[in-house]
């Protein structure tokens, strides 16, 4: 086992803090600053005999009142305090530093202490602890903590800190001193404190049988939100059970508390005490929709997973962030979603990657998954999280599920409560399973790859065999080539058939690791029947995050839509047919024949019966306009939009009666909050989008009936398809429909968020004006993360045809908001700006308008350095060819 000290030494650290005792004195007005006394036990990591370097502690914005070493108060000449560090030249090989400071409240990104009305909280990842006290604020350093918080209980009635409550006492002035002990060593970025007006709900967990320490799951929230904790209290025990069944380490604490903090930026997995924006933890008791429940599931799964995987072995440096975040997205977040929703949920992973991460690949600031940077905030990207998960997923595909479980379990055990690097994981896996070591190492080169490979797969039937040629078609210059695992199956009219792969193994699926620019393999029949009539399904399960082009005919793709057992392969074939139809329309050729093949394939699949409503919903969802546009050097906003409109209308006509029947076959369960209920409601929006595009009065009547239904989670799914309907097809004016919704749901903020999303994501010609009105109206609150996402996320990241209105007005109103938000919530803004970052890929008129807005961003006050650097880099590019 690699100890925490050994891990820290490998990071290059000369000093190590193994214990921290804090006294945090909160005044009646916390915004005036907080007095923090810290006693930090520090020792040298250098071998005896080596000259000791000065001890340098990290700090930001601290007012220093006293510095002492082993009880000796240092004079002004015995230490040097700068705005960024505290330097002590003559520090012994082992000693205790005592500092007394006033720490600021508020500041860049609300790091350190932050005050929100009624609540004081901390925000320490990645470098916030240095705004609380002088410290060795590095991720490889782990220390145990004792913390005493002194506060007026009439002002801050609930105090929570990492670890276990160890005592309470009254001070001489009548305030309450609350003490906590955390005996599990943690890096400083996992320190957490919250104090204020919070209620707590909890459930007991029975863990005696499996040796886990965790006995109690608690949720803390402001009194007006606490009734929404019931969903998380019900779903998180299932998440915990799944985590344990799939290799998570035992949780080290008796109590695990999730805290809803209004205005908190997203979610963070502080040790035993996790902080969340309420939108991703509590289901608003006044009303919520399925998206809210899914956010709770995904965020609680992700942050819990850190406790048993991604922070039990933390990162040796911030450049290795993907080790904790990518692995956690894969094994906690995505795997949990598939566990609860079924295999088709893998398609949702692919959609997230395409919509959120792929745009980062084409910007000048596109980060690699792993890399050292001056400001670790720059690493909190979709590339680190989502692409990082896919790279680890490729390693899992190569290893196979059983070997992956053994490798990860032994890795956690080896480095438990220490730190490691991505390379440590790769080498551990390679040593554990040497038969695939070369494939693992070649695939691990993805961690340093900027950009996305593209594959062309050609198949040829020869004498009962199938020859498969896999060829790289991208212009990336990775040398040696990264490994790309390609999962293949020969699919016939009864599903995948067994074949003999190039390794001599008989299976229905073969994984080929392409580690060159081109390779040809042969699949041979397992029986005398041969493989004639089969179709090769490639990249099953989305085995690698690449662009894929295939030589399959429309009829062959249709066979996959009908008979492929892998949900991703089936969905991809339907998407490919849709893409070809849109491209035909853009090229000015007749798309009728291709659309007919797709309609027949989808109709046949519906007639055969699709047991999983989520899979049915995703098969019926048209290709995403962002993915369609992003395939080519120049993004054809208008052509893609027009092609999708034709495809939508044609499928609506062809599948009309089947779609009506599908809705009837999946009626709503008004009380249903199970994942299966959510999956059934997923059907409503894509089915109505096709039906309404047919222009039938029956479709309009059904859509209005759905919208006026009694259950908001289903009713609101009908609003986006109704929004772009022409006035002559909609018997009720659109504004009247919106007014109906407002009348019903005005007292339910989460439902109103969905109501707003439907408007900002609409393809209506007046969407830009509507978004501007919403952003300047009384419903908008820029400090409310959920409300910001409701107005801007659909508009800027899901609605290219409206956002890129030729007037440029969409850009202007959006950049106004970016400039306002970036100084305090850069992490949120990063999720919204994908199209700004690829401005040179649009037509000349749009490029000029986008350039003007980027120039505004580059010179706006309060923009973080990393953002200014990215924007200036983009502006220094020449226009696209």
Task: Please describe what each predicted stretch is.
Residues 354, 382, 478-480, 524-881:
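Long, ordered, helix-rich scaffold segments
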Residues 53, 61-70, 158, 435-441, ...:
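Beta-strand-rich binding/interaction modules
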Residues 46-52, 72-73, 167-175, 206-214, ...:
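Short, glycine- and charge-enriched coil/turn segments that flank and shape catalytic ligand pockets
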Residues 41, 87, 261, 313-317, ...:
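Conserved short loop/turn motifs at secondary-structure junctions
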Residues 421-441, 446-473, 479, 582, ...:
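His/Asp/Glu-rich metal/cofactor-coordinating catalytic motifs and the adjacent surface-exposed loops
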Residues 111-115, 136, 160-166, 192-195, ...:
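Short coil/turn segments at secondary-structure boundaries
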């Amino acid at each position: 086992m690699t100890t925490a000290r050994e891990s820290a030494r490998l990071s290059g650290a000369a000093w190590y803090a193994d214990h921290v005792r804090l006294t945090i004195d909160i005044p009646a007005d916390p915004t005036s600053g907080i007095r923090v006394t810290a006693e930090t036990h520090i020792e040298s990591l250098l071998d005896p005999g080596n000259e000791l370097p000065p001890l340098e502690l990290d700090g930001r914005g601290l007012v220093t009142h006293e510095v002492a070493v082993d009880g000796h108060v240092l004079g002004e000449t015995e230490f040097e305090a700068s705005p960024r560090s505290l330097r002590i030249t003559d520090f012994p090989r082992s000693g205790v530093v005592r500092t007394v400071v006033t720490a600021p409240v508020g500041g860049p990104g609300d790091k350190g202490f932050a005050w929100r009305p009624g609540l004081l909280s901390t925000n320490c990842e990645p470098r916030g602890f240095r705004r609380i006290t002088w410290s060795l604020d590095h991720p490889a350093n782990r220390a145990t903590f004792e913390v005493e918080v002194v506060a007026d209980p009439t002002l801050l009635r609930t105090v929570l800190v990492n670890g276990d409550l160890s005592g309470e006492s009254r001070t001489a002035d009548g305030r309450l001193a609350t003490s906590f002990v955390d005996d599990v060593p943690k890096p400083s970025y996992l320190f957490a404190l919250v104090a204020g007006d919070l209620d707590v709900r909890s459930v007991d967990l029975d863990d005696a049988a499996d040796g886990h320490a965790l006995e109690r799951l608690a949720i803390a929230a402001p009194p007006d939100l606490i009734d929404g904790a019931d969903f998380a209290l019900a779903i998180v025990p299932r998440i915990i059970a799944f985590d344990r069944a799939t290799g998570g380490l035992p949780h080290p604490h008796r109590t695990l508390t999730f805290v809803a903090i209004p205005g908190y930026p997203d979610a963070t997995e502080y040790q035993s005490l996790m902080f969340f924006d309420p939108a991703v933890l509590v289901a608003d008791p006044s009303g919520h929709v399925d998206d809210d429940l899914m956010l709770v599931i995904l965020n609680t799964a992700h942050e819990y997973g850190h406790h048993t995987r991604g922070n039990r072995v933390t990162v040796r440096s911030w450049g290795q962030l993907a080790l904790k975040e990518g692995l956690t997205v894969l094994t906690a977040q995505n795997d949990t979603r598939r566990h609860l929703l079924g295999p088709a949920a893998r398609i949702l992973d692919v959609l997230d990657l395409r919509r959120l991460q792929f745009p980062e690949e084409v910007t000048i600031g596109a980060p690699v998954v792993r890399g050292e940077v001056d400001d670790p905030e720059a690493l909190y990207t979709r590339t680190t999280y989502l692409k990082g998960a896919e790279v680890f997923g490729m390693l899992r595909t190569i290893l196979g599920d059983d070997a992956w479980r053994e490798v990860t379990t032994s890795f956690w055990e080896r480095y438990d409560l220490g730190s490691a690097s991505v390379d440590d994981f790769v080498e551990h896996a390679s040593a554990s399973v040497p038969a695939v070591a070369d494939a693992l190492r070649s695939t691990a080169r993805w961690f340093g790859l900027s950009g996305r490979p593209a594959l062309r797969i050609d198949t040829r039937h020869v004498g009962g065999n199938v020859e498969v040629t896999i060829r790289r078609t991208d212009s990336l210059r990775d040398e040696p080539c990264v490994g790309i695992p390609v999962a293949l199956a020969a699919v016939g009219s009864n599903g995948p058939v067994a074949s003999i792969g190039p390794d001599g193994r008989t299976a229905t699926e073969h994984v080929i690791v392409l580690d060159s620019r081109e390779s040809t393999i042969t699949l041979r029949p397992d029986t005398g029947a041969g493989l004639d009539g089969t179709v090769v399904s490639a990249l099953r399960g989305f085995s690698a995050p690449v662009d894929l082009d295939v030589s399959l005919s429309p009829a062959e793709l249709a066979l996959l839509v009908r008979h492929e057992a892998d949900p991703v392969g089936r969905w991809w074939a339907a998407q490919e047919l849709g893409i070809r139809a849109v491209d035909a329309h853009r090229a000015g050729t007749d798309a009728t024949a291709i659309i007919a093949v797709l309609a027949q394939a989808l109709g046949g699949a519906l007639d055969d019966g699709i047991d999983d409503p989520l899979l049915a919903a995703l098969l019926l969802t048209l290709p995403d306009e962002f993915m369609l546009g992003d395939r080519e050097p120049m993004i054809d906003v208008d052509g893609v939009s027009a092609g999708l409109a034709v495809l939508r209308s044609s499928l609506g006509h062809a599948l009309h009666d089947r779609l009506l029947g599908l809705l009837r076959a999946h009626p709503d369960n008004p009380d249903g909050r199970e994942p299966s209920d959510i999956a059934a409601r997923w059907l409503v929006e894509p089915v109505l989008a096709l039906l309404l595009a047919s222009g039938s009065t029956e479709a309009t009547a059904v859509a209005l009936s759905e919208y006026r239904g009694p259950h908001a989670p289903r009713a609101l799914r009908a609003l986006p398809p109704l929004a772009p309907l022409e006035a002559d097809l909609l018997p009720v004016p659109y504004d009247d429909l919106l007014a109906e919704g407002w009348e019903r749901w005005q007292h339910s903020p989460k439902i109103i968020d969905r109501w707003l999303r439907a408007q900002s994501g609409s393809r209506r010609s007046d969407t830009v004006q509507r978004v501007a009105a919403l952003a300047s109206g009384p419903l908008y609150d820029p400090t409310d993360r959920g409300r910001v996402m409701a107005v801007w996320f659909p508009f800027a990241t899901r609605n290219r045809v409206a956002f890129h209105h030729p007037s440029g007005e969409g850009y202007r109103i959006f950049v106004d908001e970016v400039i306002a938000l970036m100084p305090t919530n850069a992490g949120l803004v990063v999720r919204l700006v994908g199209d700004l970052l690829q401005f040179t890929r649009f037509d000349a008129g749009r490029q000029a308008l986008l350039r003007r807005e980027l120039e505004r961003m580059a010179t706006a006050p309060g923009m973080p350095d990393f953002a200014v650097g990215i924007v200036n880099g983009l502006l220094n590019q020449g226009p696209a060819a």
